[in-house]
Amino acid sequence: MTTRTRRESVSFARPFRINGVDRELPAGAYEVITDEEMIEGLSFASFRRVATMIMVPAPRGSAMEMISIDPADLGDAQRLDADAGT
């Protein structure tokens, strides 16, 4: 099975919460990693998402933590952050 990993940066202007993370996260830029696998048997390349993770500061120290999240929850957090600025 062919897989690929996409990386993107998302930014939050204010502290935020997201399902799957047990604490409030500070404002800032976060790396989001999405793993996708190719759907076999099609006449064109098509991928489906199999995992989405966000890199967040660990509760203590300078380490980073990778946490699995639902992409819909990430979208909700981004909308709330954008709406809070209006």
What are these model-predicted stretches?
Residues 1-7:
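Short, surface-exposed beta-strand/turn modules with glycine/proline-rich turns
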Residues 2, 33-66:
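Extended soluble regions of mature proteins
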Residues 17-19:
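A general beta-strand register signal
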Residues 28-32:
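A short tyrosine-centered beta-strand micro-motif
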Residues 56-86:
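Acidic, low-complexity intrinsically disordered segments
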